[in-house]
A protein has these predicted regions:
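Glycine-rich phosphate-binding loop and adjoining beta1-alpha1-beta2 segment
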Residues: 54, 59-97
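Rossmann-fold NAD(P)-binding glycine/threonine-rich loop
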Residues: 133-142
Protein backbone atom coordinates (compact mmCIF):
# COMPACT_ATOMS: atom_id res chain seq x y z
CA UNK A 1 0.00 0.00 0.00
CA UNK A 2 2.73 2.47 0.93
CA UNK A 3 4.73 1.61 -2.20
CA UNK A 4 1.72 2.20 -4.45
CA UNK A 5 1.01 5.53 -2.80
CA UNK A 6 4.62 6.63 -3.24
CA UNK A 7 4.67 5.63 -6.91
CA UNK A 8 1.54 7.39 -8.12
CA UNK A 9 1.45 7.91 -11.88
CA UNK A 10 4.52 9.88 -13.00
CA UNK A 11 5.18 11.01 -9.41
CA UNK A 12 8.71 9.59 -9.67
CA UNK A 13 9.39 12.05 -12.51
CA UNK A 14 8.18 15.16 -10.69
CA UNK A 15 11.70 16.49 -9.93
CA UNK A 16 12.71 16.23 -13.58
CA UNK A 17 9.48 17.89 -14.64
CA UNK A 18 10.10 20.74 -12.19
CA UNK A 19 13.48 21.26 -13.81
CA UNK A 20 12.44 20.90 -17.46
CA UNK A 21 8.77 21.79 -17.48
CA UNK A 22 5.70 19.83 -18.58
CA UNK A 23 6.12 20.40 -22.33
CA UNK A 24 9.69 19.10 -22.40
CA UNK A 25 8.78 16.13 -20.19
CA UNK A 26 6.04 15.22 -22.65
CA UNK A 27 8.59 15.35 -25.49
CA UNK A 28 10.90 13.06 -23.50
CA UNK A 29 8.06 10.63 -22.81
CA UNK A 30 7.34 10.46 -26.56
CA UNK A 31 11.00 10.11 -27.60
CA UNK A 32 12.35 6.97 -29.26
CA UNK A 33 16.07 6.37 -28.63
CA UNK A 34 18.49 3.76 -29.97
CA UNK A 35 21.46 2.90 -27.73
CA UNK A 36 24.16 0.81 -29.39
CA UNK A 37 26.79 -0.60 -27.05
CA UNK A 38 26.09 -1.32 -23.38
CA UNK A 39 29.55 -1.24 -21.86
CA UNK A 40 31.26 1.41 -19.78
CA UNK A 41 29.49 4.34 -21.49
CA UNK A 42 26.33 3.00 -23.13
CA UNK A 43 24.86 1.28 -20.08
CA UNK A 44 25.07 4.47 -18.04
CA UNK A 45 23.71 6.62 -20.88
CA UNK A 46 20.77 4.23 -21.35
CA UNK A 47 20.06 4.19 -17.63
CA UNK A 48 19.99 7.97 -17.42
CA UNK A 49 17.60 8.09 -20.39
CA UNK A 50 15.44 5.53 -18.63
CA UNK A 51 15.51 7.51 -15.38
CA UNK A 52 14.67 10.70 -17.24
CA UNK A 53 11.49 9.04 -18.48
CA UNK A 54 12.17 8.40 -22.16
CA UNK A 55 9.15 6.58 -23.58
CA UNK A 56 10.73 4.15 -26.01
CA UNK A 57 14.25 2.75 -26.20
CA UNK A 58 16.04 0.04 -28.14
CA UNK A 59 19.24 -1.35 -26.61
CA UNK A 60 21.76 -3.26 -28.72
CA UNK A 61 24.75 -5.31 -27.53
CA UNK A 62 25.72 -8.92 -28.18
CA UNK A 63 28.34 -9.10 -25.44
CA UNK A 64 28.10 -11.04 -22.20
CA UNK A 65 29.20 -9.87 -18.77
CA UNK A 66 32.85 -10.76 -18.15
CA UNK A 67 34.98 -10.59 -14.97
CA UNK A 68 37.06 -7.84 -16.60
CA UNK A 69 33.92 -5.66 -16.75
CA UNK A 70 33.52 -5.59 -12.97
CA UNK A 71 35.56 -2.43 -12.39
CA UNK A 72 33.59 -0.15 -14.70
CA UNK A 73 30.39 -1.54 -16.18
CA UNK A 74 26.88 -1.22 -14.78
CA UNK A 75 25.66 -4.74 -15.67
CA UNK A 76 28.76 -6.42 -14.23
CA UNK A 77 28.13 -8.18 -10.92
CA UNK A 78 29.08 -11.62 -9.68
CA UNK A 79 25.47 -12.71 -10.12
CA UNK A 80 25.44 -11.66 -13.81
CA UNK A 81 28.74 -13.12 -15.04
CA UNK A 82 28.25 -14.84 -18.38
CA UNK A 83 24.80 -13.35 -18.93
CA UNK A 84 23.98 -11.15 -21.96
CA UNK A 85 24.49 -7.48 -21.05
CA UNK A 86 21.37 -6.44 -22.94
CA UNK A 87 19.18 -8.87 -20.99
CA UNK A 88 20.69 -7.91 -17.62
CA UNK A 89 20.16 -4.24 -18.30
CA UNK A 90 16.65 -4.71 -19.70
CA UNK A 91 15.58 -6.19 -16.37
CA UNK A 92 17.20 -3.29 -14.53
CA UNK A 93 15.68 -0.61 -16.77
CA UNK A 94 12.16 -2.08 -16.56
CA UNK A 95 12.50 -2.10 -12.78
CA UNK A 96 13.42 1.59 -12.85
CA UNK A 97 10.76 2.61 -15.37
CA UNK A 98 8.04 -0.03 -15.85
CA UNK A 99 6.31 2.15 -18.46
CA UNK A 100 9.28 2.28 -20.85
CA UNK A 101 8.70 0.54 -24.16
CA UNK A 102 11.95 -1.40 -24.35
CA UNK A 103 13.26 -3.41 -27.29
CA UNK A 104 16.24 -5.64 -26.53
CA UNK A 105 18.54 -6.74 -29.35
CA UNK A 106 21.40 -8.95 -28.15
CA UNK A 107 23.07 -8.83 -31.58
CA UNK A 108 26.45 -7.79 -32.90
CA UNK A 109 26.17 -4.79 -35.19
CA UNK A 110 27.31 -5.56 -38.75
CA UNK A 111 27.05 -3.67 -42.01
CA UNK A 112 24.36 -6.15 -43.16
CA UNK A 113 21.98 -5.56 -40.23
CA UNK A 114 22.37 -1.79 -39.75
CA UNK A 115 19.81 -0.71 -42.40
CA UNK A 116 17.21 -3.07 -40.92
CA UNK A 117 17.96 -1.82 -37.41
CA UNK A 118 17.70 1.83 -38.39
CA UNK A 119 14.54 1.31 -40.46
CA UNK A 120 12.84 -0.60 -37.65
CA UNK A 121 12.67 2.24 -35.19
CA UNK A 122 12.35 5.73 -36.66
CA UNK A 123 14.58 6.92 -33.84
CA UNK A 124 14.65 10.49 -32.58
CA UNK A 125 18.17 10.02 -31.21
CA UNK A 126 20.97 7.47 -31.51
CA UNK A 127 23.58 6.93 -28.80
CA UNK A 128 26.75 5.49 -30.34
CA UNK A 129 28.57 3.83 -27.44
CA UNK A 130 30.27 1.17 -29.56
CA UNK A 131 33.77 0.21 -28.48
CA UNK A 132 34.75 -1.66 -31.65
CA UNK A 133 35.84 0.31 -34.70
CA UNK A 134 34.21 -1.65 -37.56
CA UNK A 135 30.59 -1.52 -36.31
CA UNK A 136 31.11 2.13 -35.34
CA UNK A 137 32.14 2.88 -38.92
CA UNK A 138 29.15 0.95 -40.30
CA UNK A 139 26.71 2.87 -38.08
CA UNK A 140 28.23 6.26 -38.87
CA UNK A 141 28.24 5.46 -42.59
CA UNK A 142 24.48 4.86 -42.61
Amino acid sequence: MVKEKLMEKNDWQQRTELLLGEEKMNRIRKANVLVVGLGGVGAYAAEMLCRTGVGKMTIVDADTVQPTNMNRQLPAMHSTLGMPKAEVLATRYKDINPDIELTVLPVYLKDENIPELLDAGKYDFIVDAIDTISPKCFLNYE
